């Protein structure tokens, strides 16, 4: 068995001319295709590329080669790549077909012809386009309010994809450019949520992925509602707070913590709490304190359960009159789940 050895690239022109001289005649060349400069052919990755070469001189000898060596010499295939074959729709065609094109196929290809008069060449430059693909993106992140956040989104593709960041809210801002990094300085609670990274080029539809940003912040009382109560009836005080993580609630009266007992019932869900008196008596009238706390802080609001006709306002207000030791004790208790 004879083993074929690819010649050195520097010797390819000489080898090719010698090879062409040995080839049998038969394939002509259309000289008009060989008088112009290099043609560019653009093909999407995975598609089939056809590099055209048409001849007209019946006494010519033809070969295809690229930077790696000789691909075809006449009808003799030198390349070991099964994706490569000749395309002959008619007797004068000597085109090269490359199936399932990949990025390593990109480069210059030469159709070289030895005519009766002089050698001629036609060059084709194959450009391989690649759809955008996000290769790396930040994981979901949780930070405290006021921190600096950097999100990363890296993508591959040809041409180079353009990266666009967008905050997925009704009024979310779009951050556009070729930067892979999105920096948020001093992040606020309003900037929490999902961020979308979009990588786009002209080859196909964009590749899109998301990152969730959670912003922790201390509790803020958003609503505290006092209530009018008639003796012998049921009455409730309600308190709502905004916080991440969700706050824990406690109720106090006269610096004494209240538990669900003796006709009092406390119900707390995420972000809100209520204190219900099942059967109001004279001793239940007065000031109550709702305390909301999470690992970042504690706040409180003062509410009033008042008699019918009292001149006291209906809406409670945030109060700083509660002793600091009580707030500190409440926070420690909530954090330790006492």
From Swiss-Prot:
Pfam families associated with the record: I-set, Ig_3
Swiss-Prot/TrEMBL keywords: Cell adhesion, Cell membrane, Disulfide bond, Glycoprotein, GPI-anchor, Immunoglobulin domain, Lipoprotein, Membrane, Phosphoprotein, Repeat, Signal
Record-linked CDD domains: Ig (cd00096)
Gene Ontology CC: cytosol; extracellular region; plasma membrane; side of membrane
UniProt keyword annotation of Zinc present: no
SMART domains for this protein: IG (SM00409), IGc2 (SM00408)
Glycosylation sites recorded in the entry for this protein: 40, 66, 136, 148, 279, 287, 300, 315
Disulfide cysteine pairs (residue numbers): 53-111, 153-197, 239-290
Lipidation (GPI-anchor amidated asparagine): 315
Subcellular location field: Cell membrane
InterPro entries in UniProt: Ig-like_dom, Ig-like_dom_sf, Ig-like_fold, Ig_I-set, Ig_sub, Ig_sub2, IgLON_domain
Superkingdom of this protein's organism: Eukaryota
Expression across tissues: Expressed on limbic neurons and fiber tracts as well as in single layers of the superior colliculus, spinal cord and cerebellum.
Domain Ig-like C2-type as annotated: residue spans: 29-122, 132-214, 219-304
Family statement drawn from the similarity comment of this UniProt entry: Belongs to the immunoglobulin superfamily. IgLON family.
Protein's name in the database: Limbic system-associated membrane protein
Gene of this entry: LSAMP
């Amino acid at each position: 068995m004879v083993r074929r050895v690819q010649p050195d690239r520097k010797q390819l022109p000489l080898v090719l001319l010698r090879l062409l001289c040995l080839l049998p005649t038969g394939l002509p060349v259309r000289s008009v295709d060989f008088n112009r400069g290099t043609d560019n052919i653009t093909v999407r990755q995975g598609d089939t590329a056809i590099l055209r070469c048409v001849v007209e001189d019946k006494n010519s000898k033809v070969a295809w080669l690229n930077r790696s060596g000789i691909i075809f010499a006449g009808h003799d295939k030198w390349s070991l790549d099964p994706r490569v074959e000749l395309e002959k729709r008619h007797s004068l065609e000597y085109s090269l077909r490359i199936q399932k094109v990949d990025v390593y196929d990109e480069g210059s290809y030469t159709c070289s012809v030895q005519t009766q008069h002089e050698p001629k060449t036609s060059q084709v430059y194959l450009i391989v386009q690649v759809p955008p693909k996000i290769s790396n993106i930040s994981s979901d992140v949780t930070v405290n309010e006021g921190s600096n956040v950097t999100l990363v989104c890296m993508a591959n593709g040809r041409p180079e994809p353009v990266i666009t960041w967008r905050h997925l809210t009704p009024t979310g801002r779009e951050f556009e450019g070729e930067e892979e990094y999105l920096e948020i300085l001093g992040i606020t609670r309003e900037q929490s949520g999902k961020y979308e990274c979009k990588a786009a080029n002209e080859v196909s539809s964009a590749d899109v992925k998301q990152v969730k940003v959670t912003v922790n912040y201390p509790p803020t009382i958003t609503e505290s509602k006092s209530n009018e109560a008639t003796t012998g009836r049921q009455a409730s005080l309600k308190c709502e707070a905004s916080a991440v993580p969700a706050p824990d609630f406690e109720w106090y009266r006269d610096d004494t913590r209240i538990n669900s007992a003796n006709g009092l019932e406390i119900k707390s869900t995420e972000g809100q709490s209520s204190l219900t008196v099942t059967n109001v008596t004279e001793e239940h009238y007065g000031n109550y304190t709702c305390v909301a706390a999470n690992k970042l802080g504690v706040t409180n609001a003062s509410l009033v359960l008042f008699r019918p006709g009292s001149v006291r306002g209906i809406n409670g207000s945030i109060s700083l009159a509660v002793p600091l030791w009580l707030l500190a004790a409440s926070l420690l208790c909530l954090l330790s789940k006492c």
